[in-house]
Amino acid sequence: MRLPHPLPFARRVVALGVVTALAACSTLPPYSPPTVAVPTHYAGAPAAQPGWQVAAPADAASRGAWWTVFNDADLNALEARVDVSNQTVKKAVADLEQARAMVDYQHAGFLPTVTAGVAQSRSRISRNKLGSSLAGKTTSDHQVGVAASWEPDVFGRVRDAVAGAQANADASAADLQAVKLSVTAELATDYFALRSLDTQKQLLDDTVRAYADALKLLKQQLAAGAIDASAVAQAETQLEATRTQDTDIDASRAQLQHAIATLVGENASTFALPARVQAFDVPAIPAGVPSQLLERRPDIAAAERRVAAANAQIGEARAAFFPDLVLSASAGLESGFFMPWLTAPSLFWSLGPQLVGTLFDGGRRSATLRGAHAQYDGEVAGYRQTVLSAFQQVEDQLSALDALASEAASQQRATDAAALSLRLTTNRFNAGAVSYLDVVTAQTIALTNRRQADEIAARRMEASVGLLKALGGGWHAGADITAWAAGSGTAIKTQGS
């Protein structure tokens, strides 16, 4: 008895093994984060040592809640509510979960797909169907079976898709931290603005009471004939003008309170923040060296991860030029009669590979690849623009803090001088040496300078918050970015090195 020659089957097995071994190949281009040049030090801060280094998001370095540097218990309590109740943060969390789900979706491409089904049908064949022995007859079909298919990742299409999805998920994780930083900074800014209004409100309330007492005294003097009516008119004008400022403070404070309510996730109609007068203590904030900015800013990390995702899309576009290999198998039971349906003679099965490739598509794949390269170039430009904007924001806040410190010192001297002038002018009026108009003028100047001093103090706190935000705040990302941060970095060349 002659046995069938085994060579054809062996050839098929060897060919299949060779194609499967190509799964180690990948069309993904080698990736390294874009390089950016940074100065050795900020223009508004002491110089740092020049040199080269590689910067990656320092996720493992916890810096805590950055707002605690202000030592304000009310602010700390409000900031703690952001993670729990702020709706913008919740949306960013949902976006992150969606990105993570896409990673799982793409990763499923490594695994086979298995389906199962059962079907029963009864049909009648047309009498006029030529060449059919069943013409005019009614037949039944009973079938149950399973099918499996698997597409080996020969050219890395699935790996590239997973890499792109993971990079996008990492970007979403950094986006979440950027949203938190933005919301907490906005909350701190609004809070200090509100506290500044509380201080100014108390100043205006005290001033209104003092002006009212002075007006009462002037009216008594007018009745006694000691002064003329112009002094009373001037005092009344000054009192009502100050009351107008006092009312305006109330409206501005209400708007800030409503904004804070929204940031902490509470209805503005039910939220109230009791007034409290406090002296602002501007903290010392070390800016560090510019290269650290690339390690701290979550928006920079997000931009870099989007560059990586665009790089992975190039790999996916390249993989489309290669054929797809699909291994499929199916088995089941099928019978035209119900009784023998679930018996061994009803068994059927099939097994085999399929290799399919596109020969002509009118240039669609080439266009997709060009688009992927263009998207990569755009993401690189976006990353570098994010870095430039980050340095601009830091320099802006450093300059503002430096200028405001000088302004505060000058304004304090002006406030002290105005207070002294008011005391001297009041004494001269009481001695009959000047008119009450001189007193009104001195009072207005003194009040204006005190309010300006309070406003400068609030602006210094706002600039401090802005600097902390520009420096990345207390960003501490989780394990999502830590994994890639350990294996990739941004090469930085410091100018002048």
Segments the model singles out, each with a brief description of its role:
Residues S26-L187, L325-A329, G362-L369:
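Short flexible linkers and secondary-structure junctions
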Residues R2-V84, H142, Q166, D250-E295, ...:
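Terminal intrinsically disordered/low-complexity segments used for targeting and assembly
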Residues V158, A167, A173-V289, A400, ...:
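Periplasmic alpha-helical coiled-coil/stalk elements that build and connect Gram-negative outer-membrane
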Residues L222-A226, F429-A433, A470-G474:
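A short glycine-centered flexible hinge/capping loop motif at secondary-structure junctions
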Residues G117-S123, S149, L197, Q238, ...:
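Outer-membrane beta-barrel pore domains and translocons
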Residues K91, H107, P152-K180, S230, ...:
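Sec/SRP-type N-terminal targeting helices
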Residues H142-A148, D190, V289, W349-L355:
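Hydrophobic, lipid-facing positions within transmembrane beta-strands of outer-membrane proteins
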Residues R127-S133, Q234, P274, F322, ...:
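Outer-membrane beta-barrel translocator domains and adjoining extracellular loop/strand segments
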